From Swiss-Prot:
Presence of keyword Iron-sulfur: yes
Pfam families in the cross-refs: SDH_alpha
Residues where [4Fe-4S] cluster binds: C288, C330, C337
GO molecular function, one term: L-cysteine desulfhydrase activity
Substrates-to-products reaction catalysed: L-cysteine + H2O = hydrogen sulfide + pyruvate + NH4(+) + H(+)
Family per similarity comment: Belongs to the L-cysteine desulfidase family.
Organism annotation: Methanococcus maripaludis (strain C7 / ATCC BAA-1331)
Protein name, as recorded: L-cysteine desulfidase
Assembly behavior: Homotrimer.
Active-site residues, record numbering mapped to chain: C23
Amino acid sequence: MDDSKRILITKVLKNEVTEALGCTEVGLIGYAISLCNISYPFSIEKIEVTLNNGSFKNAYAVGVPNTKKYGILPAVVGGLLGNSKNKLLIFNDIKYDQKLEDFIKKRLEVKVLDGPLYCGVKIKDTSGKFFESLIKDNHLNVVIPKIEKEKISLEITDFEKEEYKSLELTDFLNYLDEIPEEIINLVEKTIYTNKNLIKGDFLNYGNDILSNMVNKTTSACNTRMTGENMPAMSVAKSGNMGLMATLPIISYDNLTENNFEKLKKSLLLAMLVTIYSTYNSSYLSSMCGCVSKGGMGAVIGLCYYKNGKNLKKLNSAARAFTANLPGIICDGGKVGCALKLASGCFAAYSSLYVEISHENGIVGKNFKECVQNISKISKAMGDLDCDIVKIMSKKEM
């Protein structure tokens, strides 16, 4: 492949495959809070957090690392106690303060707006001084305060995203022929980090290949969603998408060939496809991205592991997957996400063994058409978020 494509793919991977502690959206909130740099939190008179629908959903009922608590309030408190240099690992090494939570609870207001990823924070202290931060469009894009960018920026521009979307499945396959050392290291880190989240069985089915996929993937998801102080390697800014895209393949390898080189290439392909699916739709939406995007990554990665660069088989697997799960709603980050990942495992594995014609529903002729069609449905589901948020907001937390 030409150098420009290889450079683009490498940059995208370095930007989109990152370590995250806890659900990405509580990390987003904590990071935004920490950017306000409040030296004495008990001086706060009022704190206002504005989130887009998707960020609100994902933070509302999910565990926050190092707090033993769930939801937006402990994420805010954790952010006040954390170091902004940790970014999405903001809750790493914090010592939670219950008295501070009781204090902040009376002064916190959460607002929700429609649109792309958004986390804005406004704080007023008792002296009348104001503090502000804003992260938008992606989880690390800090708009306020202005911070010094790294000399070599990893941030992906809109133009580069469009360039990535124009790539073909064959480009991703060709990239596997000569993988940069830094990307090999990134994939290996992903294997060890995500496997480390597997703690027992969330769903104990048995020891056949599919059951093992489900057991391992749901166990890791449950570990994340309950707020264990253990990082995951996120893909396209989602830890659960990272788990869905990688753990079924890791499990398959463990029970079949134990071929580390083939495993790394299969996982890398799964990551590339998951990112590709995300760029075609959005980071957050009314459709469950773990299933629709991470699941598409998993099925293509599994098919590559099993059949190599067989485009006929790869396109067939994409069609079968598209005929199955797309359309499942996202009602926020929570323990129940593990059950959706279980469905994703079943859909990904079964897609290897069935042929579905493109004449079925939204199924496309090939991988690219399938991703584009799922993306269209995802965007059309946008209005659902308002109703999902209304239902969630009525609950006592």
